[in-house]
Curated annotation (Swiss-Prot):
GO molecular function, one term: peptidyl-tRNA hydrolase activity
EC assignment: 3.1.1.29
Catalytic class of the enzyme: hydrolase
Function: Hydrolyzes ribosome-free peptidyl-tRNAs (with 1 or more amino acids incorporated), which drop off the ribosome during protein synthesis, or as a result of ribosome stalling. Catalyzes the release of premature peptidyl moieties from peptidyl-tRNA molecules trapped in stalled 50S ribosomal subunits, and thus maintains levels of free tRNAs and 50S ribosomes.
Lineage: Bacteria, Pseudomonadati, Pseudomonadota, Alphaproteobacteria, Rickettsiales
Positions contributing to tRNA binding: Y15, F65, N67, N113
GO BP: any one term: protein quality control for misfolded or incompletely synthesized proteins
Keywords carried by this UniProt record: Cytoplasm, Hydrolase, RNA-binding, tRNA-binding
Protein name as it appears in the record: Peptidyl-tRNA hydrolase
Protein location: Cytoplasm
């Protein structure tokens, strides 16, 4: 039985390494660490199928804009008959501290348009890993903030490395231990150089 790990983001080089693409960054790191094959386009998504230890895993990056993420993910879930309990979505979250992660199942979408889209097509009964991107310090418009680049990319990469290092705990549904392990990394701030 497959597990689906999906990362949310926007396609296009102008969005690479932006806060809103934190989910894509996690999926790319998993692909590299576990030597998955290169992504192939299928059903408006980039997918790669491989193994993480004994788990058969499909990595997914919806190749649509964030607001339309639900359709390609629904198509992959349907095609591979993936139970929603085996689906984990990685996404950016402005309501938690920079480079902090939280795992939850179901619940609200906190205004995240990618999650709203998934919820519309699949319901809410799936796992989410919320990647904290912090909240803008000044009066910057929220949409401009999430589409801006990280200042402290080293901290982002360290957090992503910790997520990838402990990803098997998520697949085992050991969410509390996963969160504790990733939390034990250093605290960071995303301050300009």
């Amino acid at each position: 039985m497959f597990h689906l790990l999906a990362g949310l983001g926007n396609p296009g080089t102008q969005y690479t390494l932006t806060r809103h693409n934190a989910g894509f960054m996690v999926i790319d790191a998993i692909l590299d660490k576990f030597h998955f094959p290169n992504f192939k386009k299928k059903n408006n998504a980039l997918i790669s199928i491989g193994n993480i230890e004994s788990y058969r895993v499909i990595l997914v990056k919806p190749w649509t804009f964030m607001n339309n993420s639900g359709v390609p993910i629904m198509n992959i879930v349907s095609l591979y008959k993936i139970p929603l309990d085996n689906m984990i979505v990685f996404h950016d979250e402005v309501e938690i501290d920079f480079c902090t992660i939280r795992v939850k199942k179901s619940g609200g979408n906190a205004g995240h348009n990618g999650l709203k889209s998934i919820d519309n097509f699949l319901g809410k009964d799936y796992w989410r890993v919320r990647f904290g991107i912090g909240h803008p310090r000044n009066k910057m418009d929220l949409s401009d903030y999430v589409l801006s680049h990280f200042h402290n990319l080293n901290a982002v990469n360290n957090t992503i490395s910790s997520i990838v290092e402990h990803i098997t705990l998520l697949l085992e549904k050991n969410h509390t231990t996963f969160t504790d392990k990733v939390r034990n990394t250093l605290k960071y701030e995303d301050i300009p150089d």
